[in-house]
């Protein structure tokens, strides 16, 4: 049996938590998502089910078996397939009326302006170690007055930061500048989750390898990220509810059953953050030494 798609019917169960007129607003919003792997893919599908009608999506990578533990599009049938092709197809299966602009080469300095054209909100789905393009993307969002959300899968939970127009920027919060990638990685971890709820239950620290750009991950964390990020997106796009911008942050850890709200004026320049970074450098040096990297 062939079914005819109807937007109102497809997203009718949103109504109640979302007003009918708000659903129409969401239908005409455009969200940019860079990276369609661990969090990016599930961000796209979750926001599709919220009824967002337009997306700019970017990813240059292909699915591999190492993606099976967490990535929405990773299956036996998609091994070797382009992530952007798989996720675009899945999104169009949810809403065939999507206004979908695809960037199969990923986001680069040369296409960044096109990627952010007509965008109402940017949701970060980039790989943790994609420092250069992440830095450029968030800077471009700040310049254009585009709100941006980063939701990081940490342990078995999520850490979320909102960067809103006219408020603290990504660079002001993390303080990356021209620092080496290893220092950017440390500042990213410490800045994303100042409460550090996840630190006590990592059972095999040797699996954290910043030098080889490999860290452990869980599907639960990615799913939680998508739920929180989509809720923040709803509030930002509809202009209702409380949206706390950086230097405010939020970390929810399902393993511990704990929620922490943080406030770090100055971002990583805050005294508590400076102490955490100093301790982190010592721990990172010891870890890299144990792994034979230094």
Language-model features: locations:
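Phosphate-binding loop/pocket of nucleotide- and phosphate-handling active sites
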Residues: 1-17, 236-294
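Conserved N-terminal Rossmann-fold NAD(P)-binding element of oxidoreductases
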Residues: 33-35, 58
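Hydrophobic/small residue at the entry helix of a nucleotide-binding pocket
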Residues: 39-40
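Glycine-rich phosphate-binding loop and adjoining beta1-alpha1-beta2 segment
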Residues: 54-95
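A structured beta-alpha segment of the ubiquitous adenosine-cofactor-binding alpha/beta core
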Residues: 80, 84-121, 125-134
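ADP-ribose/adenylate-binding Rossmann-like module
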Residues: 121-164
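Oxidoreductase and adenylate-handling cofactor-binding alpha/beta cores
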Residues: 165, 224-241
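A conserved mid-domain beta-alpha-beta active-site/ligand-binding segment of alpha/beta enzyme cores
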Residues: 170-224
């Amino acid at each position: 049996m062939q079914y005819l798609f109807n937007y109102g019917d497809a997203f009718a169960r949103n109504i109640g938590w979302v007003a009918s007129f708000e659903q129409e607003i969401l239908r005409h919003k455009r969200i940019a998502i860079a990276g369609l792997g661990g969090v990016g893919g599930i961000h796209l599908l979750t926001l599709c089910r919220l009824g967002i009608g337009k997306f700019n999506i970017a990813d240059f990578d292909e699915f591999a078996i190492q993606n099976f533990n967490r990535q929405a599009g990773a299956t036996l049938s998609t091994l070797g397939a382009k992530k952007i092709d798989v996720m675009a197809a899945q999104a169009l299966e949810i809403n065939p009326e999507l206004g979908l602009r695809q960037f199969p080469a990923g986001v680069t300095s040369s296409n960044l302006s096109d990627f952010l054209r007509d965008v109402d909100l940017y949701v970060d789905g980039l790989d943790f170690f994609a420092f250069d393009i992440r830095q450029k993307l968030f800077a471009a969002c700040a310049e254009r007055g585009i709100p941006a959300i980063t939701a990081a899968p940490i342990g078995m939970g999520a850490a979320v930061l909102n960067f809103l127009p006219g408020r603290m920027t990504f660079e002001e919060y993390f303080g990356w500048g021209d620092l080496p990638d290893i220092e950017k990685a440390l500042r990213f971890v410490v800045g994303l989750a100042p409460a550090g709820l996840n630190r006590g239950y990592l059972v095999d620290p040797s699996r954290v390898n910043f030098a080889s750009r490999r860290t452990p991950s869980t599907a639960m964390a990615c799913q939680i990220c998508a739920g929180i990020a989509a809720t923040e997106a709803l509030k930002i796009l509809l202009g209702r509810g409380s949206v706390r911008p950086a230097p405010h942050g939020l970390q929810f850890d399902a393993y511990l059953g704990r929620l922490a709200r943080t406030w770090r004026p100055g971002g990583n320049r805050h005294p508590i953050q400076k102490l955490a970074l100093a301790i982190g450098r010592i721990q990172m040096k010891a870890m890299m030494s144990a792994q034979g990297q230094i």
